[in-house]
Amino acid sequence: MALKSYKPTTPGQRGLVLIDRSELWKGRPVKSLTEGLTKSGGRNNTGRITSRRRGGGAKRLYRIVDFKRNKFDVAATVERIEYDPNRTAFIALVKYEDGEQAYILAPQRLAVGDKVIASAKADIKPGNAMPFSGMPIGTIVHNIEMKPGKGGQIARAAGTYAQFVGRDGGYAQIRLSSGELRLVRQECMATVGAVSNPDNSNQNYGKAGRMRHKGKRPSVRGVVMNPIDHPHGGGEGRTSGGRHPVTPWGKPTKGKRTRNTNKASQKLIIRSRHAKKKGR
């Protein structure tokens, strides 16, 4: 979908660039496929902030999206494409031949009336899901499982995709948009195509209030805090911090690797996403 830019009739309109969602469904979601969603405000079960800069925002209903695509060999027709406030991608309402309805992630170039199917070996059309064992090499895919039957976890955000580049001893090699090359089991499901709404990253919300509507609060720099609140805090006048950039808890930030190298999935990463960086 295209981007909409606005004339600066007010300060909040100046620089505003939003996604044109005029072609999406304008009604409410299917009630049987929605749940209530309680806001956490970034707090955990003890009431402490574990994820900063969250809180407020408009109320949402959670749409139950089918990431597993495990209803095999039953064709489904796309009824409509909908907006989902809980993710950057759009979602598609599909109706199976047996009458069941489900929400799936809408890939690019999926239109109302299209047929989609999940099968052991399906046509290479956007929205069709199949395991890597039945897929030709070179296919662009999204919503990729990391464990068979667990549901898609990789390449679910707007505009993302991965490329199936090879097979190796029961594993499929996929190249992610970050540049990472990794292995997943051939039994893992993936959906053909790239995720919808590729222009999402080109939006400019124009004013802080629009981010507050999305539930995002201001990000305060450590250098303007007091010493009790941040390692960069304190000092008379403006100071540069006096040490390498760290988080509020003293851990190095801005590029420091934090991934645990003892993770079980570490051996499935053939080429790190950092390998392309100079001097690394």
From Swiss-Prot:
GO terms for biological process: cytoplasmic translation. PROSITE patterns: RIBOSOMAL_L2 (PS00467). Residues 33-55, 199-266 are annotated as: Disordered. InterPro entries: NA-bd_OB-fold, Rib_uL2_dom2, Ribosomal_uL2, Ribosomal_uL2_bac/org-type, Ribosomal_uL2_C, Ribosomal_uL2_CS, Ribosomal_uL2_dom3, Ribosomal_uL2_RNA-bd_dom. The keyword Oxidoreductase does not apply. SUPFAM superfamilies: Nucleic acid-binding proteins (SSF50249), Translation proteins SH3-like domain (SSF50104). Residues 209-219 have a biased composition (Basic residues). Pfam families: Ribosomal_L2, Ribosomal_L2_C. Belongs to the universal ribosomal protein uL2 family. Part of the 50S ribosomal subunit. Forms a bridge to the 30S subunit in the 70S ribosome. One of the primary rRNA binding proteins. Required for association of the 30S and 50S subunits to form the 70S ribosome, for tRNA binding and peptide bond formation. It has been suggested to have peptidyltransferase activity; this is somewhat controversial. Makes several contacts with the 16S rRNA in the 70S ribosome. This is Large ribosomal subunit protein uL2. The lineage of its organism: Bacteria, Pseudomonadati, Pseudomonadota, Alphaproteobacteria, Rhodobacterales. The gene is rplB.
